[in-house]
Each structure stands twice: as C-alpha cells, then as structure tokens.
C-alpha cells in the first residue's frame, strides 16, 4: 500500500502543473501495481477537489473527484477516526511544517503503508520514517 498526497494527484490531473510529467510517470507505475493499493484520505480528497475547482473549474474538480471515488486501485480512508492521532502528530512535530492534512498522511503512511507516500511535498522528506516516491529514480 501507498498513501497518495494531493501534490501528486493534482500534478497528474492538472496538465499545467510543474510536476505533471513526473506525476504521470509515477501514476503509470502506481497503476501497474508497483506499490499495491493506494490510500486516499478524506482530507486529501477535499484538498484535490477544492484546488482543481479553483485552478481549473467545477467540472474538472467533479470529474476527477468521481474518478478517484470510483477507482478500484484506491481505498478511501475516512478521517474522523484519525482525528485525535492527527492532532498529536501535527502538534508534536519538530523540524517540519506539515499541514494538518499532511500530518494525517504521515500517520497513515506509518501505520498502513510502510511509510510510503506519493508526493512532491518536500516536508515529508524531513521525516526518516517516510519513503517518498519510493524507487522513483
């Protein structure tokens, strides 16, 4: 399993994004089963659809949201049960500036995905327990 971050998914779905080419390569590997099933946190779904609506339009955001929710390669992870753990991770971070959603990603990656995350967020690289875009070189 691997946790998917909004920077990866937005990079893939927004052809104008600076990370589009790299995200497309990673997506090919993900869809080929390199890391197994992807974990899509509720918080990340909210980020993706909001950003795509603002940067593109509502129809793009809605279409991508539906693709993500219907994808057999993804497991949707509701975040209500993760809230207390995420508060701890967020509040006790040192040497990083993880957003609340990123703190949830870090927690889930550690507990369910052997620390693996698909992301272009440099803050994750500061955490030794995480592996960002594993074997992507």
Residue ranges and their predicted role:
Residues 62, 67-81, 93-95, 124-137:
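Short acidic, glycine/proline-enriched helix-loop-strand junctions
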Residues 75-116:
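Active-site neighborhoods of divalent-metal-dependent phosphate/nucleic-acid chemistry enzymes
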Residues 5, 47, 102, 121:
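Acidic active-site catalytic centers that drive phospho-/nucleotidyl reactions
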Residues 1, 106-107, 111-137:
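Acidic, PIN/NYN-like endoribonuclease modules and their adjacent C-terminal/linker elements
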Residues 3-4, 26-55, 77-78:
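PIN/NYN-family metal-dependent endoribonuclease catalytic core
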Residues 1-18:
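Metal-dependent nucleic-acid phosphoesterase active-site entry motif
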